[in-house]
Amino acid sequence: MARNLDPKCRQCRREGEKLFLKGEKCFTDKCAIERRAYAPGQHGQKSGARLSGYGVQLREKQKIRRIYGVLEGQFRLTYKRADSRKGVTGENLLSMLESRLDSVCYRMGFGASRTEARQIVRHNGIVVNGRRVNIPSYQVRPGDVVEVAEKSKAQLRIKAAADATATRGYPEWIEVDAKALKGTYKAHPQRSELPSTINESLVVELYSK
């Protein structure tokens, strides 16, 4: 299966902000953005060229794709589905990205990063409403109960991620029992509950051309 093999820290430096792709490392002073807050490459420290309007839109799309770990084809398909729904297209897009099973598992603390959560899903480590689901892009619906499969609950990486996430706290749209490694997706997130550093309207402008 195709995936982005670019080093995670390099991706954050390219966007000039933390994308939280490396789990706990992102919350420490070992984070690459803390050490080298400039673009990667030979001319990274000198890169001050202004982007065109199209360049700004493209950069924002790339940033959102990297945050959620979605490839171009998947992202475009998600956008088309978001555009066909009632409501604001950009907000629909973010809601659909957040309701992906891998993203929900990450938010619930079943993986230290979305990448790790995606691996756990693919390896049959997650159960939704009592049924095993191994498709990371599976759309979780309000009221769905998501939990770590019994055979995977002993994994140290899952326990460590669950403990760390419980310490930081959970988003309002989910409810989690960290000890049972089980949670409920209560509702789709409101736009005000998602990062203000994301400008989804730029993606809408890009795809509307």
From Swiss-Prot:
Part of the 30S ribosomal subunit. Contacts protein S5. The interaction surface between S4 and S5 is involved in control of translational fidelity. Residues 99-159 form the S4 RNA-binding domain. HAMAP family: Ribosomal_uS4_B. Belongs to the universal ribosomal protein uS4 family. GO terms for molecular function: rRNA binding; structural constituent of ribosome. Disulfide bonds: none annotated. This is Small ribosomal subunit protein uS4. Keywords: Ribonucleoprotein, Ribosomal protein, RNA-binding, rRNA-binding. SMART domains: Ribosomal_S4, S4. One of the primary rRNA binding proteins, it binds directly to 16S rRNA where it nucleates assembly of the body of the 30S subunit. The gene is rpsD.
